[in-house]
């Protein structure tokens, strides 16, 4: 039966054309943005998962940066204490030298002058060594300096760097004096005591640095794996989408041609009236 009020073929072809154009637009959007999920309507569940993964990856990235800052802080402190150790060793050496009875008062005075300069520098390093404004050392025995390094988004994701307190009373100009044998002996005792504290602080900072380096390695691996998983969820598969776009283009062209054919068949009805 031939009718003219409803062109079912043209309607069906038009619907097919609309579907093909939507498919084409979606494929082109995904290819242009590189994202399979560009809005919640594309994949609501996938978007939620990918968003959470993105938050985790960014937190890990900041944790890596924080950890590297912590490593730099530990290196700054350890480097300063290395110089303090060298100076303290030199003071001890001069004290041992001063204990010998072969040196005159003038000789010991010259030795003490060097000790005095070293004492000032030791005090300066322990007082003024800072990292981004954070004081790294305490000159009070038993009073430690602790710096918490956030390594992730959770409250428990943290590493504490601890700088042990160093007894500053044993590093004063009075405590380090080699003007006579008795004072030199006291100086040796004071140096030995504080060297133990300095060594303990260096060990603490070194252990913290090693832990932070492990944290960086672990976070880097986790962030890489999580980024890869997120990519599989939200990123465009170019081979698949290119195929989908080609298919949509063919369907769009074919449906447009069929619309023309369906409209032409309606025109043929006129020939029956001639």
Question: Which sequence ranges carry the predicted segments?
Answer:
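Primary detection of the long, small/polar-rich alpha-helical "axial" segments characteristic
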Residues: 1-274
């Amino acid at each position: 039966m031939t009718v003219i009020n409803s062109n079912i073929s043209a309607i069906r072809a038009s619907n097919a054309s609309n579907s093909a154009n939507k498919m084409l637009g979606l494929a082109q959007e995904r290819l242009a943005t590189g994202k399979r999920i560009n809005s919640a309507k594309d994949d609501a569940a996938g978007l939620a998962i990918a968003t959470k993964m993105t938050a985790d990856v960014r937190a890990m990235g900041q944790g890596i940066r924080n950890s590297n800052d912590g490593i730099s802080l530990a290196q700054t402190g350890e480097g300063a204490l290395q110089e303090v150790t060298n100076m303290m060793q030199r003071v001890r050496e001069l004290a041992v030298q001063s204990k010998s009875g072969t040196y005159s008062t003038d000789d010991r005075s010259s030795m003490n002058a060097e000790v005095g300069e070293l004492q000032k520098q030791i005090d300066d390093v322990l007082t003024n060594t800072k990292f981004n404004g954070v004081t790294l050392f305490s000159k009070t025995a038993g009073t430690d300096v602790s710096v918490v390094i956030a390594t992730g988004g959770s409250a428990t994701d943290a590493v504490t760097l601890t700088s042990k307190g160093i007894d500053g009373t044993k590093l004063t100009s009075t405590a380090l004096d080699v003007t006579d044998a008795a004072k030199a002996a006291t100086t040796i005792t004071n140096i030995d005591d504080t060297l133990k504290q300095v060594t303990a602080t260096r060990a603490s900072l070194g252990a913290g640095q090693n832990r932070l380096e492990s944290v960086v390695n672990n976070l880097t691996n986790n962030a890489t794996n999580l980024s890869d998983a997120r990519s599989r969820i939200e990123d465009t598969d170019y081979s698949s989408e290119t195929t989908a776009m080609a298919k949509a283009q063919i369907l769009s062209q074919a449906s447009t041609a069929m619309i023309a054919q369906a409209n032409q068949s309606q025109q043929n009805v006129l020939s029956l009236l001639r």
